[in-house]
Amino acid sequence: MSSAEIIGSTNLIILLEDEVFADFFNTFLSLPVFGQTPFYTVENSQWSLWPEIPCNLIAKYKGLLTWLEKCRLPFFCKTNLCFHYILCQEFISFIKSPEGGEELVDFWILAENILSIDEMDLEVRDYYLSLLLMLRATHLQEGSRVVTLCNMNIKSLLNLSIWHPNQSTTRREILSHMQKVALFKLQSYWLPNFYTHTKMTMAKEEACHGLMQEYETRLYSVCYTHIGGLPLNMSIKKCHHFQKRYSSRKAKRKMWQLVDPDSWSLEMDLKPDAIGMPLQETCPQEKVVIQMPSLKMASSKETRISSLEKDMHYAKISSMENKAKSHLHMEAPFETKVSTHLRTVIPIVNHSSKMTIQKAIKQSFSLGYIHLALCADACAGNPFRDHLKKLNLKVEIQLLDLWQDLQHFLSVLLNNKKNGNAIFRHLLGDRICELYLNEQIGPCLPLKSQTIQGLKELLPSGDVIPWIPKAQKEICKMLSPWYDEFLDEEDYWFLLFTTQNRFISSRQHKREFIGKEENILLYKRIQQSLELSQALADMKEMDYRQWRKIATEDLKQGGSLQVELTSPVFLTDITKMSFEELCYKNPKMAIQKISDDYKIYCEKAPKIDFKMEIIKETKTVSRSNRKMSLLKRTLVRKPSMRPRNLTEVLLNTQHLEFFREFLKERKAKIPLQFLTAVQKISIETNEKICKSLIENVIKTFFQGQLSPEEMLQCDAPIIKEIASMRHVTTSTLLTLQGHVMKSIEEKWFKDYQDLFPPHHQEVEVQSEVQISSRKPSKIVSTYLQESQKKGWMRMISFIRSFCKYRRFMLNPSKRQEFEDYLHQEMQNSKENFTTAHNTSGRSAPPSTNVRSADQENGEITLVKRRIFGHRIITVNFAINDLYFFSEMEKFNDLVSSAHMLQVNRAYNENDVILMRSKMNIIQKLFLNSDIPPKLRVNVPEFQKDAILAAITEGYLDRSVFHGAIMSVFPVVMYFWKRFCFWKATRSYLQYRGKKFKDRKSPPKSTDKYPFSSGGDNAILRFTLLRGIEWLQPQREAISSVQNSSSSKLTQPRLVVSAMQLHPVQGQKLSYIKKEK
């Protein structure tokens, strides 16, 4: 028998002896899916019931225990709470013995869940298969921590058949052995370290000193013994309130109406300096007296209600200010890839994600408790699903599964982790569409057609957040009557077991309402139990509040569900405070007081009618004065060259400073500041600094007094979208940067360009246009027609040239010829220039010795060239541009094929992995290379950052490399045009019989080594350019050329053969260097 089966067959009165079991079992019993939520206090062995049983009925604890064993304990054995309790017992038993990774804990829990299932049972076969595939995908992989720490060979385990009886037994034995090894690792290493860490952390907290003293007393006390025996004095707490009829459904609705829905995100932090009383020990008659100015309390009951409302209000304020890590957000526990062999009929296997009911998903009073119940059903062992299964309600079961899968999809969607979520979210969305929304598999679910269509269209993309709450609300409405029937059936069996009565008479005493403070405490207990059950899937570092909370938890008086009302904040008499003290303690109240005082002043002040006019003088500044004001500034020097476009201005430091002063004179410097700020964000590599920079940009340009359109002087629609976004990404800001840059170029660049004298060619073109404008209209029309015809001919010739280029690249030999030409362009000393010691931008003649000693150590001299558009490129990267352009075209072809596959419903995970692999290869080779420089193509830095940001965000479309294609394409066409001209010239001269003076190809590295350093011995050396080399001495073969007249002076000598152990791409593995 497994441990869960042993627990299920043990008498509950024996299990409740254990304080740890009572704590886990109380958490399970308080889940909101159940109607009756009893609570057991270990200290006085007393049960507290909610809803309470009427006073005329006598509740017996033996009947209650029988009902718990029949209706609650079997579901508890199926939950993660039970498996964590078993692991906790293993730890405790190890601690009490004389001896004394998170991933190992996950593996132990998952293996325990698998070993507790009978795989031959047809009803749970799909669930068993899904758990097994999840185990393979997460922990049984080569190189995983579990396999490494357990020192197991998993090949034999992975090759076992799933359904073969003998092999199933073998699998159980192997998993059981691995589980024992993992438990030993946890007990022998992680648990002692955890206890050491716990003692050191709790010793720093003052609230934990009493707990530490008790621990030391028990540790060193020899006479300390555990008090055993059965709790024969077990009892049930008496009822304090009179009610006509017992109904958990009505009690839930009353509680939901009394509790404010805004308190759904309420944190349950305890007082650090006081131990709170559990719900059962809270006295409902206790009064909270609060003195407020100019208010008279009508009665003590009104005082309690108002104080509780304030308590909840300020608890929300404190929770928002503290932002404690214990607050549970939507996070997805899945970070691994799901096996592609998972069948669609298998229910998704997921650890319960930590969910918080957000204010965005607000339900009505009638559906609020159903929303909580459906959240808790999976954590409680699916009792509501089991009820629907007994009634054979297949459609309702499918609706419940859809609700829980949508809840899990929402948690994956809102997860803040980045690695792997895009693929899993896409797969989960496709699976939901295929399993629930596909009309070909079965009948359509009874949801609205608009909701189904919205889910179908937006689930795979992830933009489905508005449709998930709508679909869940429709499902809640349809499951509401069945859930009420489930609660009624629970009430029937509970009363039958506990009181031996099936019906309750309606004759009762006067009705008394339950206080609101009790409902708040009860709601906190229910919410805490749900959060604890969902939090078992994720383990995080505890903050100081959680360590202090451990000190206040007593397993005998509530344990983990020990809750209390948060102490009110700022509930002091504000009339006795000075205004400065009020501003310091409560700024919001101080502002409100100022507003009230001003309102009273306006009401009492005499009204005087007067008119006020504001006369604004208009400044008329001529263009010549603006030029002079700019020229008068001595700090900013006017550049000498006239810029051709705005990109040149932004890339040139001197132009940028002068352009900034130009915009400052015209009060239009804010758009340029935005461009500079976004450029800093795109360069920044630290995520925290990048987030802070983005927040500063949003506060400065989108949350100011003026509208963002006026500040940025741009009317792009994306500005309004960014202003309404909660989370703004870097790629979105880069997109807006392009729009703002275009707006600046349209409004101000022409005026800025007019500050500089035009080029000679521009003057000629302007003169021709002025002369032609004076000619008759017929001549002008003829000229326009001819120029249009010439333009079309040039366009046709350009398209033909590009088509010829693509055909040329398909032939490997011709492609190699083009690459050889690009190598020759490196030696073009007329047009190339180096930028090693030249910062002015003027061309400098390249050095004759390109392969210098510095280059031997890996310092490559970058050769530059100015092409059309006055763009400066690196000639060294021309071949890389050729390959980069080709790889980007191949990626776009993959995107097109993936789109066609998606239309034909043949799109799967392999296509996504293939495209991601292609993107990673392009990134590693050209944009983020391991060999300096990292950027090895002629693409601007901001364009590279935009591509990396798009890859990080998970985009898989043509827009990823669109900007890079537009940057590299002119470079490739420039060299292609020159290559065609060079080839035609060479063919013509060869045809005429003339010699064609070709530039020498780049010389191969002929490195000379001093023979005195190595002699006849082998040498091992390392350079950044060629890596590790093995140099061996060899005899040089005397050639026929050396036997000539000059060979008299040439003596046979040693040469060095260099074998490269780690060759660079494009070089041979081994070669021999010879000297002549």
Swiss-Prot record:
The protein's matches in SUPFAM superfamilies, at most eight in alphabetical order, are given as: Regulator of G-protein signaling, RGS
Bilayer topology reads: Single-pass membrane protein
Recorded GO CC terms: membrane
Compositionally skewed regions (Polar residues) per UniProt: 834-852
Tell me the compartments it is located in. Answer: Membrane
Q: What is its main location?
A: membrane
Pfam families given in the database record: RGS (PF00615)
Residue span, RGS domain = 645-764
Q: What is this protein called?
A: Regulator of G-protein signaling protein-like
